[in-house]
Every structure is written in C-alpha cells, then in structure tokens.
Swiss-Prot record:
Chief site of localization: cytoplasm
Domain of life: Bacteria
Keywords: ATP-binding, Cytoplasm, Kinase, NAD, NADP, Nucleotide-binding, Transferase
Binding site for NAD(+): 75-76, 149-150, 177, 179, 190-195, 214, 248
Pfam families in the cross-refs: NAD_kinase, NAD_kinase_C
Upper taxonomic lineage: Bacteria, Pseudomonadati, Pseudomonadota, Betaproteobacteria, Burkholderiales
Gene label: nadK
Active site per UniProt: 75
Biological process, per Gene Ontology: NAD metabolic process; NADP biosynthetic process
GO cellular component, as recorded: cytoplasm
Protein family membership: Belongs to the NAD kinase family.
Known EC number: 2.7.1.23
Name the UniProt record assigns to this protein: NAD kinase
GO terms of molecular function: ATP binding; metal ion binding; NAD binding; NAD+ kinase activity
Length: 300
C-alpha cells in the first residue's frame, strides 16, 4: 500500500447538466464529511444541483483552499477542471459517471468505499502533461489556451481540405493537405488521435504526437516528437479552418494564421487507487483480450 499526503479540504465537482448527478454527489459529500473532511463544492456544480449548505467556491478559490478535487462525471468534466486547476497544482480524483472514462477511472458504484481511503492517504500519484497554444495573426498573438488532451486544427464539414505548413523548433517539417492535424499529449493519445490511427502513448512517456486527419498523401503518418518541441502550424490554404482545444473551446482561423503549440509549464496531478493499472484501463476501455485463452490478472 502506498501512503501519501492526507487531505483536509475536499472539493466536489460534477457535470452539472447530467441527469441524476445530484444524488450521488450529495451521497459522496455526506460520506466524506462523516469521516471528518471539510467538503466544498465547485460553484457551478453547487448552483445547478444545490450544495446542501456546503461552501461554494470558484476554481481559483478551490485551488487556493482545497487539497484535492474529486470530479464526478465523464472525461470531459475532468479535462475542463484539470485545465482550470493546473496553475494551483491541485490533485484530481476522477469518478466515472459518463461513458468511456479513460481518465475518470473509479466506478461510481465504488466511490463511497474507495474515495475516503484515498483522502486518508492511500493512493498512487502521477503527473499528466498539458499543452499550451497561442494563435498568432499578423505577428500578434490573439488567443491563448491550455489543452489537456489535444489541440486540433481542422476544416469545417462542408469546405475543402486544409493546407498546413508545419515546423518544429523553427525547422520546416512538411506541407500537408488534409482534413486537419491533431497535436496530442500522451493523455490525449487515446482520444481523437486514436480514432485517426495515431499511436497510444503511455501517460508517463515524455512525448507529443502529431496525427494527420485524413491526409491527401498516405505517406503523411503520425509522428511522436520530444515533449520539449515547439510546433508551429501555419494556415496556407483552405476555407473555414478552425482550431479547438480539448473540443471545449473553438476559434476560427484566417489564411496565414499560425498556431504555436508547446508543452505547458503546468502539469495535472492525478490520484489513483492503490493497485491502479493503466494497462487494465486499456484492456477494459478498448475491449482488448475479449476472448482470452487464459485469464490474466487485472494488474498485469
């Protein structure tokens, strides 16, 4: 068993527009408070579902006051909160109340048993990489954002191919005609990048993966770069091209705009139950080993 820091103040975050989220959040809050932890709610969550008298805090206030944030929802909820809390180095515990749940790895049915043990110090910790990106237009930055999974440059549904000029560390790599380009972290390698035939990167691998989306030339293949690479993507052709960050914020692009992407100085601490296995997560979520010749241990 790995014993880490024991927490005092615990922030609860839920996907507030999800039907049926109020009851499990209230149940978890009562369970945690009964064991002597101070419970606070993220403000939007509290407003949407009611916080039963618990303090309601903004993400910045959570970062300053809470020792850990427990997120009940899907991966999208975890991504959004991870970006907001990254500057404060607040650890996240993810409880899956969505569908796939690559990064919300605790089943909701187990949360009342597992979460109190983790808050008491029984957990495994890992750091996840973030990307930071900015859009440069006519030599001036016009937009800045963080991305936990990926930065995606792509065309709209009814326009032709995008034409992109890609450079790494100031060196020209290629011009590409495609539906777009994904720049993904190891965490994001199992998201949109995976569906575009990109490789899976272990979360502790120090790399950034570039994955073309439906490239015109089949020789345009995914490539894994060192995680200290500075990537520049210039729009040199095409109409209705945009960029999104974790599929949660979007910006329209113009001809000659450049998207500059690099590893962020921030990381996001994830806390997992003792015995957590990334490979078990892959087996379960990707349906590997569906018909095994022999059963393997979950922690293999």
């Amino acid at each position: 068993m790995k014993i880490g820091h024991q927490f005092h103040t615990v922030a609860l975050v839920g996907r507030s527009n999800t039907p049926g989220i109020a009851e499990p959040l209230a149940s978890l809050a009562a369970c945690i408070a009964k064991r002597g932890f101070e419970v606070v709610f993220e403000a939007d969550t509290a407003q949407a579902i009611g916080s039963a008298g618990y303090p309601a805090l903004t993400p910045a206030e959570i970062g300053a006051r809470a020792g850990v944030a427990v997120v009940l929802g899907g991966d999208g909820t975890m991504l959004g909160m991870g970006r907001q809390l990254a500057p404060y180095k607040t650890p996240l515990i993810g409880i899956n109340h969505g569908r796939l749940g690559f990064i919300t790895d605790i089943p909701a049915s187990d949360m009342r048993e597992v979460v109190p043990m983790m808050l008491a110090g029984s957990y495994e910790r890992e750091e996840r990489t973030l990307l930071e990106a900015r859009i440069v237009r006519n030599g001036e930055p016009i937009y800045h954002a963080l991305a936990f999974n990926d930065v995606v440059v792509n065309r709209s549904g009814f326009s032709g191919m995008a034409e992109l000029r890609v450079s790494v560390d100031g060196r020209f790599m290629y011009n590409q005609r495609s539906d777009g380009l994904i720049v993904a972290t190891p965490t994001g390698s199992t998201a949109y990048a995976l569906s575009s035939q990109g490789p899976i990167l272990h979360p502790q691998l120090q790399g950034i993966v570039l994955v073309p989306i439906a490239p015109h030339a089949l020789s345009n293949r995914p490539i894994v770069l060192p995680d200290d690479s500075k990537i520049a993507i210039q729009i040199i052709g095409g109409r209705d091209v945009n960029v999104n960050f974790d599929m949660q914020s979007f910006t329209a692009l113009e001809l000659n705009d450049t998207i500059e992407v690099r590893r962020s100085k921030h990381t996001v601490p994830f806390l997992h139950p003792v015995g957590y296995s990334y490979y078990a997560t892959l087996r379960k979520k990707l349906h590997w080993n569906e018909h095994p010749s022999s059963e393997e241990d979950d922690d293999a």
